[in-house]
Design a protein with these regions (language model features):
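Extended hydrophobic leader/signal-anchor segments used for secretion and membrane insertion
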Residues: 2-452
Length: 452
């Protein structure tokens, strides 16, 4: 049964006015006037009641009323969670040890969406509480159409140095499903390509153009290998920005900064930044003979997932090359652990002379590939860069030396077509040696530096 506007009570009009006013404030905030089409429905809920929103309440069948009451509650909860997660805050669980010991694996975070301003979803039709895949059934948790362009509404502030930030992994646009928890598609493709062309190439003897051709060959071969072997690598999927894996890192570089790592110390514009209290690196720790007691691991805060006992005989040659050669009376190598340690933990272990024989920082041979994947450098995790971080409106001169650093920003994030031909660089069909960035960029890094 519906009512006329004359029959509506004063209380109904007040509630309706408040609801519409709040909704208009919301539309102004998100700058989306398409939402005005919802106002007649709000008016109907409070005043005219022509749409039978609660038709099931009048059913004579108690089973219908019971089932529909649950359906009604679930739909309301899902809609509420959807909007809260997008515009106010969202719960996340830490998936990796990247920020150990500041944040631990499995920790739950409530992340404010209003600090930097909520991002309007790229894929609005999605299931709340599922990032990209529905549990059990394993299908996509979102519908790819429609897709909205990137837009962020005003928030309370901007990203600052040392802020801990949750973001969608930029290189997660393409994933090989069987490897999505361990590496991105591009790192996997370059790595597989290098494995296929296993012959060592003297990159120092090549020009930048020749080096680029080698990396292009690696990527093409690796990509073909992945696409042609779905049983091994899984289906290859493309994901919109808001459906890529969530990462949590610390901001160590802002737009316009020049970042460099010197002997493990992050430098911004030539000056050392303040290190996080729980900054840690990976080490190999050899004892004088006994195993490290569980009690000591608990006191140090080193979890089972963070430690590896290098007992397999296959490790021996590598350990000896590092100088971890302490042996017991039977000639067997004393126990060696692979551990992430803060400075305090390092000093505690090193000071225990009765238990600890040697501590060696993890060599670069244990490091994986580093950004950019198609640029030959002699950078490593402890000595890296310098790299200038792009800022909106800034123009750079493109050269063979810096193009691999910025081409992903130009192509994947800012939507341009880039080609490198024999006579130069072409962007959107025009030859150029300059590019002006459309967006700000930030450098994120974990406190667990060698695992980030």
């Amino acid at each position: 049964k519906y009512t006329t506007m004359k029959q509506a009570t004063r209380a109904q009009w007040i509630k309706c006015a408040i609801a519409i006013l709040l909704y208009l404030v919301f539309l102004i905030w998100v700058r989306s006037w398409w939402g005005l089409i919802v106002i007649p429905f709000i008016f109907d809920i409070y005043i005219t009641k022509k749409i039978p929103w609660s038709f099931w309440k009048r059913s004579k069948n108690p089973a219908v009323r019971s089932v529909m009451s649950w359906v009604d509650a679930i739909i309301f909860a899902l809609v509420a969670v959807y909007f809260v997660n997008i515009y106010i805050f969202q719960n996340y669980q830490i998936p990796s040890s990247s920020l150990e010991k500041s944040l631990l694996v499995g920790d739950f975070l409530y992340v404010s969406k209003m600090s930097y301003g909520p991002r309007v979803p790229n894929t609005p039709l999605s299931m709340p509480l599922a990032q990209h895949t529905l549990p059990i059934v394993g299908t996509k948790s979102y519908i790819e159409w429609p897709q909205w362009k990137y837009k962020r509404v005003p928030g309370f502030g901007n990203v600052k140095l040392n802020d801990i930030v949750v973001f969608n992994f930029p290189a997660g646009d393409t994933v090989a499903v069987n490897y999505q928890q361990t590496t991105d598609f591009y790192t996997l493709a370059y790595g597989e390509g290098q494995r296929i062309y296993s012959k060592q190439i003297d990159m120092d003897s090549l020009t930048r153009e020749q080096q680029r051709a080698v990396y292009d060959l690696y990527y093409a071969a690796g990509r073909k290998q992945i696409l042609n072997n779905p049983r091994t690598y899984g289906e290859v999927l493309w994901r919109p920005v808001d459906r890529r894996e969530n990462y949590v890192k610390r901001c160590v570089g802002l737009p316009g900064d020049t970042l460099q790592i010197v002997d493990g110390q992050v430098m911004i514009d030539g000056k050392a930044i303040q290190n996080p209290e729980n900054l840690q690196f990976n080490y190999f720790v050899q004892t004088t003979g006994p195993y490290i007691p569980e009690e000591m691991f608990r006191e140090l805060g080193i979890s089972n997932a963070d430690r590896t006992l290098m007992e397999d005989s296959g490790y021996e040659i590598g350990l000896l090359e590092m100088g971890l050669d302490s042996r017991n009376a039977q000639g067997k190598l004393n126990p060696v652990y692979h551990l992430p340690l803060t400075k305090k933990m390092y000093d505690t272990l090193l000071g225990n002379k009765k238990l600890i024989s040697k501590i060696i920082m993890e060599p670069e041979a244990y490091a994986g590939q580093m950004y950019p994947l198609n640029l030959y450098t002699k950078w490593d995790r402890n000595n890296y860069g310098p790299i200038w971080i792009p800022s909106k409106g800034a123009t750079i001169t493109l050269t063979p030396d810096n193009l691999p650093i910025y081409e992903r920003c130009i192509v994947a994030y800012e939507g341009n077509k880039l080609e490198v031909k024999s006579d130069g660089i072409y962007i959107n069909g025009e030859k150029t040696n300059e590019y002006t960035f459309k967006m700000d960029y930030y450098w994120m890094m974990g406190d667990n530096r060698h695992n980030s």
